[in-house]
Amino acid sequence: MGKRIGLLGGTFDPVHIGHLRGALEVAESMQLDELRLVPSARPPHRDTPQVSALDRLAMVECAVAGVSPLVVDDRELKRDKPSYTIDTLEQMRAELAADDQLFLLLGWDAFCGLPTWHRWEELLQHCHILVLQRPDADSEPPDALRNLLAARSVSDPLALQGPGGHIAFVWQTPLAVSATQIRQLLASGKSVRFLVPDAVLAYIDAHGLYRAPN
């Protein structure tokens, strides 16, 4: 039986309990051997991160230290070009055994935006896609995705077979936390305790991140 590896990318600017709790729930429900959090360097579809790649990486490392099966994968930060998910999947797939399963975790909004991604039609050649369902996900997917869902979706995520090729929806506890909200609180001098892990808060405080200049 091959390994089951999950992949959750993001700017993690900063990483917060929404990312982490969702990741842990999926890792447990999907019985993953490993769930890799992959900080992105210069994501083509997102605004430029507010703090450096090294700080974002350090915060994710603080957040998952000792929390199995969550681990950090820093490969995208080592690239000197835009950070495309397809490149990461190709690289990871080449490192894994033929019977290992790779699962790409995507929030509903990111999933709906897939047709704008670089070489998006090739993603399922390398992995299964797990769409993290939220109760407020009421927007309709574009036509290209509706066709893909009709052809590739599986109702039971645990029934996904083979190294890749299918899509399933996974429930996660809704936590109305966003990195934008956390940055705004910090910039206005307010506390973000209990929105980020204590180790991340200590790092933010020690390095004066996200604070408005005096």
UniProtKB/Swiss-Prot annotation:
E.C. numbers: 2.7.7.18
Residues spanning the signal sequence: none
Q: Which reaction does it catalyse?
A: nicotinate beta-D-ribonucleotide + ATP + H(+) = deamido-NAD(+) + diphosphate
Keywords on record: ATP-binding, NAD, Nucleotide-binding, Nucleotidyltransferase, Pyridine nucleotide biosynthesis, Transferase
Provide the top EC class. Answer: transferase
- Matching InterPro entries: Cyt_trans-like, NadD/NMNAT, Rossmann-like_a/b/a_fold
* Gene3D superfamilies the record matches: HUPs
The biological processes this protein is annotated with in GO are: NAD biosynthetic process
User: What GO annotations for molecular function exist for this entry?
Assistant: ATP binding; nicotinate-nucleotide adenylyltransferase activity
On whether ATP-binding is a keyword of this UniProt record, the answer is: yes
In which pathway is this protein known to take part? Cofactor biosynthesis; NAD(+) biosynthesis; deamido-NAD(+) from nicotinate D-ribonucleotide: step 1/1
Q: Which residues form a coiled coil?
A: none
Specify the domain of life of the species encoding this protein.
Bacteria
Q: Which family does it belong to?
A: Belongs to the NadD family.
Cited HAMAP family: NaMN_adenylyltr
Its job: Catalyzes the reversible adenylation of nicotinate mononucleotide (NaMN) to nicotinic acid adenine dinucleotide (NaAD).
Q: What is this protein called?
A: Probable nicotinate-nucleotide adenylyltransferase
Tell me the organism: Pseudomonas fluorescens (strain ATCC BAA-477 / NRRL B-23932 / Pf-5)
Q: Which gene encodes it?
A: nadD
